[in-house]
Design a protein with these regions (language model features):
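Hydrophobic, aromatic-rich transmembrane alpha-helices
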Residues: 94-98, 198, 279-322, 333
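Membrane-interface transmembrane helices that cradle and orient dolichyl/undecaprenyl
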Residues: 106-107, 147-163, 198-201
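Short periplasmic/luminal acceptor-recognition loop of GT-C membrane glycosyltransferases, typified by
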Residues: 425-468, 496-506, 541
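Signature aromatic-anchored transmembrane alpha helix within multi-pass, membrane-resident enzymes
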Residues: 7-19, 112, 162-170, 185-190, ...
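Transmembrane alpha-helix segments characteristic
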Residues: 18-19, 115-121, 166-171, 187-188, ...
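Membrane-proximal, lumen/periplasm-facing interface regions of secretory-pathway glyco-
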Residues: 30-44, 388, 394-438, 455-457, ...
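Hydrophobic/aromatic-rich transmembrane helices and adjacent perimembrane loops
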Residues: 47, 137-140, 174-179, 183, ...
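Transmembrane-helix signature of polytopic, membrane-embedded enzymes
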Residues: 84-85, 101-125, 142, 156-162, ...
Length: 544
């Protein structure tokens, strides 16, 4: 056992590390939003809602059909004119999840393990990345963690209904945050009757009650999620649009979208079958930011190693703890497999398993530390303590190294100190920003811009932007008999200006069009577009 004085010193050390980590994330966040999803969705759609005076359908933005519980919160900082605050709103959900982990581990192990669990969670690279950007994933992490922990408490407290209600409400909030919450709903709806029936295996009445509790959980969760379902059904005839649209609207079936995730990876990255099948393990070791081939994010490899040690010495654990470890482990494994088979893997898609894996990892470390036999000498105990200490230090070192890399990449001090202005900072990461700012300052309020290969990043535009639809634009060019007809078709959609990303547009046109289409497109660009401004590989044109 650790001496009380040593434990107090370790507690203080971990608290200092926690405060340093939180301060670092706060500094990293204090720059203008430049992440892709923020500019296409999480800030762009709330801004449009604010300008419109309420929620309305935006057919050109597929993201606008997603559930938006957290996105609606971002309307508050946008209304106040400070979009940086949206990052701190998102970070709050990470802090709340860290508190949940701390509270659970404090009750199950001790204060020292609880502090380490919170520190480990908040410093994991993908959590840091999400904390300093405007996403919604940390909201999903928080609500799914609340849901599963209160499900465990429901069993612990003799199945008092209030804990099941809290779990179901949290699952409903998770659904309203991101569609990945559907996996949480499916798994926990199955877990509810399973957990209850394990206590009353020989009673027919209890089996009916187990089914009742599962149905009750499902009903409460879907009730909270229902406003988003109803909205989408009214607009698109598909409550989960754009998911499963081939079921609800078979006429809209896209052959490309029907390609499975395994085939996609084979086509895009030339991966072998073994490489693809090993993705559930590879994500813990090979993750890279901004690289879809390597899952667009980073985890800590120990999250897939240490949880297995949580099962060591199970016979000495209370039956309640054994059950909770199994449930947390089952949730993490099943969620990971569902995400793996359903779509091309991104680490952001599996964030709900991170809190359970952190809890299991801390249990694993605790088991390694406490593992002992009577014949073990004092020297072996010291070796075991040294091993745990080395593991803890190495885990935190991996996370700390990532945070240092973020300071280099984000460069917050240059902006905070005033050496770099807001527009200059944004333009460094989003080269189309200069063209968008020119349009904001020089185009009339009723201008309508077609954005072509600007990545749908329209948040910083104060003019209406209609985003480029590849299939529709190609169909328009294919059906045009002349450059004049192409101009007519574009103006007929109310388009007055175009913003074009040159490199991607040229590559796309050369690959997709034949001689006739290229001639029409060339005449259109030469005779019916007037270049107003160009910078950073992007140009603003006026239709003439």
């Amino acid at each position: 056992m650790i001496k009380p004085s040593t434990q107090a010193a370790l507690n203080i050390t971990l608290i200092i590390f926690l405060l340093a980590l939180i301060s670092s994330i706060a500094i990293l966040s204090y720059v203008p939003p430049v992440s892709k999803d923020a500019l296409t969705h999480h800030l762009a759609v709330p801004k449009l809602y604010l300008n419109h005076g309420g929620i309305y359908e935006i057919p050109s933005l597929e993201f606008s059909y997603y559930p938006m519980n957290i996105d609606l919160l971002y309307m508050i900082p946008l209304y106040l004119g400070n979009d940086i605050l949206a990052k701190y709103i998102h970070f709050i959900f990470a802090l709340l999840t860290g508190w949940l982990i701390f509270d659970y581990l404090k009750r199950k192990i001790n204060n020292l393990s609880a502090l380490f669990g919170a520190l480990l969670f908040l410093s994991i690279p993908i959590i840091v990345k999400l904390s300093v950007n405007v996403y919604v994933d940390l909201g999903l992490v928080f609500f799914s963690t609340v849901s599963i922990l209160f499900l465990l408490k429901w069993a612990e407290k003799d199945f008092q209904l209030k804990y099941l209600i809290i779990s179901a409400l949290s699952c409903g909030f998770a659904l309203g945050t991101k569609y990945n919450g559907l996996i949480v709903l499916f798994l926990l709806t199955l877990f509810v009757p399973f957990i209850y029936s394990r206590y009353f295996q020989n009673s027919t009445r209890s089996q009916y009650r187990a089914i009742y509790y599962g149905a009750f959980f499902l009903f409460i969760s879907l009730l909270l999620f229902s406003p988003w379902l109803i909205k989408n059904f009214i607009w698109t005839n598909n409550p989960l649009y754009p998911l499963f649209d081939n079921w609800f609207n078979p006429a809209n079936l896209d052959s490309i979208s029907s390609i499975g995730p395994f085939a996609q990876r084979r086509m895009l990255y030339q991966e072998s079958l073994w490489e693809t099948l090993l993705i559930p393990l590879r994500i813990f070791f090979q993750g890279q930011d901004n690289n879809p081939r390597y899952f667009d994010g980073k985890l800590n490899p120990f999250l897939v190693i240490l949880p297995f040690f949580a099962f060591c010495g199970r016979k000495n654990d209370p039956s309640e703890l054994q059950r909770e470890i199994k449930i947390l482990f089952a949730f993490a494994i099943l969620f990971l497999l569902f995400a793996f088979f359903m779509r091309d893997m991104r680490i952001r898609y599996i964030t709900p398993i991170i809190a359970p894996l952190v809890i299991l990892s801390v249990f694993g470390l605790d088991k390694i530390y406490r593992f002992e036999k009577k014949e073990y000498s004092e020297t072996s105990k010291k070796i075991r303590i040294g091993l745990v200490s080395m593991l803890v230090c190495f885990m935190l070192f991996l996370n700390a190294r990532y945070i240092v890399e973020q300071f280099r990449y984000i460069a917050p001090l240059s902006y905070i100190s005033g050496r770099v202005g807001r527009d200059e900072y944004i333009e460094k990461y989003r080269p189309e920003h200069a063209v968008i700012q020119y349009a904001n300052k020089n185009l009339s309020d009723n201008a309508r811009i077609l954005g072509i290969f600007i990545g749908n990043r329209g948040y910083y535009s104060d003019r209406e932007v209609v985003f480029f639809n590849i299939k529709l634009f190609r169909k328009t060019i294919d059906s045009a008999v002349s450059a004049e007809r192409l101009l007519y078709d574009i103006k007929n959609k109310g388009i007055s200006h175009l913003i074009i990303g040159f490199d991607l547009f040229n590559e796309w046109a050369n690959i997709n069009f034949g001689k006739r289409e290229k001639e029409i497109l060339g005449n259109f660009l030469k005779n019916h577009l007037h270049l107003l401004f160009s910078k950073g590989g992007y140009g603003l044109y006026k239709c003439i």
